[in-house]
């Protein structure tokens, strides 16, 4: 959860960073869709929920999760007091949860399994 101590400017920076990272990760997929004649994500055929493309929902989810992780990571770096250190330690599971949610949203978006398994 992002509290009021995060300024709008910091939040905007985190959203932009999340969007840049996500767009870079989806660049090949986007190129394929553009080659097929789709100019926006909403135009790409697929299932819909509440009249919005599932891909749009997943993209938004990935941006939200990436933003949350970015803000939590930066927020814990700003505090140097003992209380701040305790807050920073408490944020670590949230960061991991945000990163997991980001991975899942991207994998669902791309239609690949959420689980990576390697044989040893």
Where on the chain are the PLM-derived regions?
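Short loop/turn elements at secondary-structure junctions
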Residues: 55-120
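Conserved short "hinge" loops at termini or chain/domain junctions
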Residues: 1-41, 107, 111-120
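Amphipathic alpha-helical interaction surfaces
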Residues: 21-28, 48, 69-77
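Short, exposed interaction segments that mediate macromolecular assembly or regulatory contacts
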Residues: 38-59
